[in-house]
């Protein structure tokens, strides 16, 4: 349920204005990559969250194999079922704690930099659209369409609103592939997005800035007057 997140009509507002707006790109390794109107940037890592999920899946897989060799309803099968429930409960509590820290750190950074509005890519709706292979491949859907991703978005929106920060969710299609300098579409490889026109930028912050551009201008394009810093870009790295 995403009732606390508002969707606004498309606007074309200046990239830089009296408001400091931040674009946020969500990811599996870096939960939130942020880039604002004043060219401040930060990355809030979600590595621990991914590690928790991997450990949970490994443990559940081992139990499932043992249960397959047991008779359903037997004492052994029931013991394994209880162990499975304990793993799920423990993992859920650990995830909730990490999600709180990740979203709290992100909102604290927004407050520190005077952010008045968050524009974030709508990966949850994309992940639900399982027939649209062009927008998100199956592997990425499995990574992003999960409980943790939805909770991250919920918690971020809740904390933002409690601090008086507006939040807008937009279609994030092409924000990772589009070069804002020449408009070329290129699938990023490695940690740096590189285009044949000479544009280079940190891959995750490239996506966040394109979300900011798309949400404020209605198109992914930078102007010479933007005074955009060149790669390597300076950013804060926050380990939750």
Spans of features found by a protein language model:
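Positively charged, helix-rich recognition surfaces that bind polyanionic ligands
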Residues: 1-240
């Amino acid at each position: 349920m995403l009732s606390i997140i508002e969707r606004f009509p498309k606007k074309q507002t200046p990239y830089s204005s009296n408001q400091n707006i931040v674009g946020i790109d969500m990811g599996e390794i870096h939960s939130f990559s942020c880039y604002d109107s004043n060219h401040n940037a930060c990355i809030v890592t979600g590595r621990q969250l991914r590690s928790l999920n991997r450990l949970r899946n490994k443990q559940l897989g081992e139990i499932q194999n043992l249960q397959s060799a047991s008779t359903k309803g037997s004492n052994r099968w029931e013991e394994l079922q209880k162990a499975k429930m304990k793993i799920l409960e423990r993992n859920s509590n650990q995830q909730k704690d990490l999600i709180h820290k990740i979203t709290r750190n992100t909102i604290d950074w927004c407050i520190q930099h005077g952010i008045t509005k968050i524009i974030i890519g709508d990966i949850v709706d994309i992940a639900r659209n399982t027939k649209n292979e062009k927008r998100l491949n199956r592997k990425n859907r499995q990574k992003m369409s999960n409980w943790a991703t939805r909770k991250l978005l919920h918690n971020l929106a809740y904390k933002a609103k409690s601090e008086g920060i507006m939040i807008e969710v937009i279609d994030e299609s092409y924000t990772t592939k589009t070069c804002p300098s020449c408009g070329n579409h290129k699938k990023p490889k490695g940690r740096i997005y590189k285009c044949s026109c000479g544009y280079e930028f940190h891959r995750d912050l490239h996506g966040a800035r394109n979300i900011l551009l798309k949400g404020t201008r209605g198109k992914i394009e930078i102007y010479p007057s933007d005074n955009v810093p060149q790669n390597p870009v300076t950013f804060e790295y926050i380990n939750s």
